Amino acid sequence: VIVRLESSGGMVHAYGLAAAQLARIKEAGLHLTVCIDKVAASGGYMMACVADKILAAPFAVVGSIGVVAQVPNFHDLLEKHDIDVEVFTAGKYKRTVTVFGENTEEDKQKFQQELEETHKLFKDFVRKYRPNLDVEQVATGEHWYGEDAITRNLVDALQTSDSYILEKMTNSELYAIQSRQKPTIAQKLGISQAAQAVVATAIDKLPDALAKLESAKMPMVKK
């Protein structure tokens, strides 16, 4: 099985599930090759590392084994305008850092601890599927291009997916499987297509409208 993978990452639980689904392919006894033509970073690499073989284009972005969270805080702004936000929880750490309330040092430390624990799980996952990889060396959140990624054992070879597939076509029968996103309600009703048609028609008529407007301009005379 060959999987073309392109992802810069996202939520941990979503990519953990996606990686588990790829692992099922291997559990079924099938050889899994992941091809990275553009990017497989963070959660994307979490998915890629499951493969028996990882191929990357020379300038594909690979790595970013780390965890990041950004939380804006409006407490000072709200306090300036005499606005209080009440947060009610059951359980000491049900809510650590918050957007509207005041974040204490204990809250921040707990949140940082959770990030570190998630990072450890990420590293352990990569280590499980890439035992020859020096995980501590590459689990800094940095990313590398394919040329450098191969020297760090993040990938196994430099090759584009097209090149690899064409190579396999010489002695194998290939079947392309494409997923289709569930259509939205607007697409089902044809609303989105109608809107696109209106926009396209308006764009087509724009040059004529501008020409008429230009010809209708009256010369200006200074008194």
Q: How does the language model describe each region?
A:
Residues 61:
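Short glycine/proline-centered loop/turn elements that form peptide/ligand docking sites
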